[in-house]
Amino acid sequence: MRLKILVTAGDGIGPEVTNEAVTVLKEVANLGGHTIDLNAKRIGGVAIVHDGTPLPADTLAAALDSDAVFLGAVGGNEFNSLPPDKRPEAGLLQIRAALGGFANLRPAFAFKELAVNSPLRPEIVEGADILFVRELLGGLYFGKPREWNRETGEAWNTMRYTRDEVVRVTRIAFQLAQKRRKKLTSVDKANVLEVSQLWRATVNEVAAEFPDVTVEHQYVDAMSMHLMNQPRNYDVVLTENLFGDILSDESAVITGSLGMLPSATIGGKVNLYEPVHGSAPDIAGKGLANPLGAILTGALILRHSGGLEAEAAAIEAGVRKVLEQGFRTPDLARGNAAGFTVLSTKEMGAKVRETVKSQLVNA
């Protein structure tokens, strides 16, 4: 298998964590007899400095000519005075729009070894493994009309979806549920919102195509509570843009650190992958960044763009093994290093690479 990946490391800790993820990807590819062609381009603040724009034309062209785009992080305090459409984050929004992905995949899982990092009790989070599928191009964030009328003191936004928009993201969610534990929870507010009534009716319609998947519906307010007191009850969670934004961020407490979470945006011309954490400029270049979210993002690339399930699972198992062995980055040690070996960004990347290699060689 040959996979062409554009790496846009971006700003802050982006280059550090992305570098460690790429070394793991290379190791896995070599061991499996696969070829990964890597191409590096600028995006975000580094592109503003060197190219005068957050998304250079050659970066976008390279993205559209790739099998996957691997983004590190964008942003920095020195760019906050720029107009919004000139800031690093604008480059991310532009590349997302150009690639056309409409389904955002965000895993939320609990590592037994990190239960102490979660504000929830260990017996609640242990064993939780949720995949959020969030519709990314419709809903309140994109609906029109939208306006803030400062003269009248009024503002309004429009939550709008078409049946086709709901169908396409729902099919992806069901297909993913078929590969997992065959349960799908659709989240809406159908007791109040007409757009949610369309959403629920459409999900039920598509469900007929997937009789092997169990379907349930939850109101978003109830779901926000259930996520915190019974997260193990959920497998694939499907929802619209606003609700998905809020719920997937809330679910980060299950894992206990944003540095552990990967994400993927699929369904468009080219899939876009990025760890959930930001650019964290305050720790950039100090070896303090947690690369595990980026490494797990690499696993998503292999799974969703390469079709390499065994290799993706090996990376995920390698991360778990390293945590079981007591290795931590500073954010995971949380000032209490008793019994842990605290590693730098590069050391953690090397430890995961070594562990994954050992597992694949001995498989």
State what each model feature region is.
Residues 11-14, 67, 133, 173, ...:
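Buried hydrophobic positions in well-ordered alpha/beta secondary-structure cores of metabolic enzymes
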Residues 49-156, 242-244:
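N-terminal glycine-rich phosphate/adenylate-binding segment common to multiple enzyme folds
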Residues 191, 199-200, 204, 208-262, ...:
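Accessory "access/gating" subregions that flank catalytic or transport cores
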Residues 137-138, 142-180, 184, 190-192, ...:
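Glycine-rich phosphate/pyrophosphate-binding loop and the adjoining helix
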Residues 31-57, 225-227:
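N-terminal beta-loop-helix "entrance" segment that forms/cooperates
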Residues 6-23, 27-29, 150-221, 233:
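Glycine-rich phosphate/diphosphate-binding loop of Rossmann-like nucleotide-binding domains
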Residues 1-5:
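Extreme N-terminal starter segment of soluble prokaryotic enzymes
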